[in-house]
Curated annotation (Swiss-Prot):
Free-text activity regulation comment from the record: The formation of the proteasomal ATPase ARC-20S proteasome complex, likely via the docking of the C-termini of ARC into the intersubunit pockets in the alpha-rings, may trigger opening of the gate for substrate entry. Interconversion between the open-gate and close-gate conformations leads to a dynamic regulation of the 20S proteasome proteolysis activity.
Record protein name field: Proteasome subunit alpha
Subunit comment: The 20S proteasome core is composed of 14 alpha and 14 beta subunits that assemble into four stacked heptameric rings, resulting in a barrel-shaped structure. The two inner rings, each composed of seven catalytic beta subunits, are sandwiched by two outer rings, each composed of seven alpha subunits. The catalytic chamber with the active sites is on the inside of the barrel. Has a gated structure, the ends of the cylinder being occluded by the N-termini of the alpha-subunits. Is capped by the proteasome-associated ATPase, ARC.
Lineage: Bacteria, Bacillati, Actinomycetota, Actinomycetes, Micrococcales
GO terms for MF: threonine-type endopeptidase activity
Organism: Jonesia denitrificans (strain ATCC 14870 / DSM 20603 / BCRC 15368 / CIP 55.134 / JCM 11481 / NBRC 15587 / NCTC 10816 / Prevot 55134)
Length: 236
């Protein structure tokens, strides 16, 4: 009589975590950071149709890396949650903290009970009426939540990108200077390719800002002109 195959709970959770991390690492990194104008989200994204950065509600933005169909389902669920809560109570009752807790429940349940964990990493940010009230929440594949201060990098070679970005970024920077620091950080080659010279296409950025100067719906997408420093007075 053959013995039943046994996997310890510790090994099962470790395998699930490794599976999710590998899926997330294949995605291009996203940087979320504060600046004087608000909270900026940015990533490299060559697709014009599939967004990794989106609006959830008046003062709340969403960014994710990993499997697109999974984080898109989270985004849609977040919008429905926010709309229902804002309609049932008051628009001011819709907060990033409550949304992060709802996402944590979904991610945690999938990690422990579903056939496979969700291959996603999520950031939810809420713009405060002043910089001291800005809130940034980082959610991992297992449902764990961390409140970040100032900036966070998810996906890709996040350790290298985070180190490069923090070396040149300050929370009191302008939007233009913050975007310059972001592009420098995102242009870092992955560690495994650092010793190889590769010809790559020019990066295409997806970026958005929760704009503190806007009274209600603060989310606005940034264009390529926002990434180009002003060149007034340089005619030849």
């Amino acid at each position: 009589m053959s013995m039943p195959f046994y996997i310890s709970p510790e090994q099962l959770m470790a395998d699930r975590a490794d599976y999710a991390r590998k899926g997330i690492a294949r995605g291009r990194a996203v940087i979320v950071a504060t600046c004087t104008e608000g909270i900026v989200f940015a990533t490299e994204n060559h697709s014009q149709a599939l967004h990794k950065i989106s609006e959830i509600y008046d003062r709340i933005g969403f960014a994710a890396v990993g499997k697109y169909n999974e984080f898109e389902a989270l985004r849609v669920a977040g919008i429905r949650y926010a709309d229902l809560r804002g309609y049932s109570y008051d628009r001011s009752d819709v907060t990033a903290r409550a949304l992060a807790h709802a996402y944590a429940q979904t991610l945690g349940t999938a990690f422990t009970t579903e056939s496979k964990p969700m291959e996603v990493e999520v950031v939810v940010a809420e713009l405060g009426h002043d910089a001291s009230r800005d809130e940034i929440y980082h959610l991992s594949y297992d449902g764990s939540v961390a409140q970040e201060h100032g900036c966070v990098v998810i996906g890709g070679d996040q350790d290298t990108i985070d180190a490069v970005f923090r070396s040149s970024w300050e929370p009191t920077m302008s939007l233009a200077d913050t975007l310059t620091a972001i592009t420098q950080a995102l242009s870092q080659p992955p560690q495994k390719d650092a010793e190889h010279t590769m010809v790559t296409p020019a990066p295409t950025y997806e970026a958005a800002l929760l704009d503190r100067s806007r009274p209600r719906r603060t989310f606005r997408r940034l264009t390529v002109t926002d990434f180009v420093p002003s060149t007034q007075g340089t005619r030849s």
